[in-house]
Amino acid sequence: MAKFEVVNKYLDTEKYPQCPVVLPVRATKNAAGYDFCASETVLIPSYNHNVEQLKGYMADKTMYSLPQVEGITKFTGIKPTLVPTGVKCKLDSNQYLEITARSSMPLKYWLVLANSEGIIDSDYYGNESNDGEICFQLINLAPSDIVIQQGDKIGQGIIKTYITVEDEEEVTTERTGGFGSTDDKD
């Protein structure tokens, strides 16, 4: 059975006398998604600040490999902003949490989820890197910076189950970190 919890760092009453975390809830009785709120106030810079720099960098190129895209990110400083929620999600081993943008985000605020949707695996919960804190990767397409206030709704999550193929070799690798830790780094 799935359960939302506050990550440990926000349980420190000396640092956070009043816990800033709002646990996700469904807005209506038939809503599939649980609304997530920002646990901190976060500035999301406008993507447009670096567009001219990006155009100059890309002028003579037509296609990019992933390492080149990493170079573009380092050169221009253009990258998504992680907005923390202060929430972790305990899931059964055959479940995952799909996080998506709220439908109003692009229309009202010019904000989009950088990866369209995020997949939170059951073994992300409580990892030693970030205690399983769920963050949303947002990109600001507005002409100016946007500030997300603590408590603002920033996305939604839908708990889903999955199945595996019957002839899969047993996977014994275990998660060793948090955000992005399952990337293959040969």
Model-identified regions with their sequence ranges:
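DUTPase catalytic domain/fold
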Residues: 1-186
